[in-house]
């Protein structure tokens, strides 16, 4: 049940982030210069859906260990919640406010907090740590992509 609650929470955050994205993905975003390694738009929804599911499973596995180490689990889940909120904030900054520079600064912080979450999770549940690796890799790629988009459009 804990895993289900965590997966549903992560998917809900993804849904709310998509609301900010929808307003600009077909209007403002196509007008931006993008690097050659920019993935096609259709790829983002399935990748993020899978990542939110993996994040939720990881958080549920950690939450399941609450009785064995309340302090560490609580600390890890607070950091997880912080990165989840930063994940949502990125969509608002980049697509909602149409501000790649602010989103770029925020995503660097997000990536660091995701890494901290991974570190905390793997010390509680190795599997939970492994489940966050695709998320770290994707947000690392998204960070490079965000920097490139900002750089290519900095005069706008």
For every predicted segment, state its role.
Residues 144-156:
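Juxtamembrane boundary at the C-terminal end of a transmembrane helix
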Residues 53, 57-91:
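Helix-adjacent hinge/juxtasegments
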Residues 39-54, 98-110:
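Membrane-interface loop-to-helix entry segments
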Residues 94-97, 116-130:
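Membrane-helix boundary connector in multi-pass membrane proteins
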Residues 90-101, 124, 152-155:
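Membrane-interface helix caps and helix-loop-helix hairpins in membrane proteins
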Residues 23-36, 68, 153-156:
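Membrane-interface helix termini and inter-helical loops of multi-pass transporters
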Residues 77-84, 103-117, 135-139:
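Hydrophobic alpha-helical segments of small multi-pass membrane proteins
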């Amino acid at each position: 049940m804990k895993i289900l609650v965590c997966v549903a929470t992560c998917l809900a955050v993804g849904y709310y982030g998509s609301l900010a994205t929808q307003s600009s993905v077909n209007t403002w975003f196509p007008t931006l210069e993008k690097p050659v390694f920019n993935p096609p738009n259709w790829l983002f929804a399935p990748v993020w859906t899978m990542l939110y599911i993996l994040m939720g499973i990881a958080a549920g596995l950690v939450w399941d260990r609450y009785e064995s180490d309340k302090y560490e689990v609580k600390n890890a889940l607070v950091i997880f919640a912080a990165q989840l909120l930063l994940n949502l904030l990125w969509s608002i900054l980049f697509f909602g406010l149409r501000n790649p520079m602010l989103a770029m600064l925020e995503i660097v912080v997000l990536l660091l907090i995701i890494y901290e979450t991974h570190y905390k999770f793997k010390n509680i549940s190795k599997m939970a740590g492994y489940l966050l690796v695709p998320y770290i890799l994707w947000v690392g790629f998204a960070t490079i992509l965000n920097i490139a988009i900002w750089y290519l459009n900095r005069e706008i």
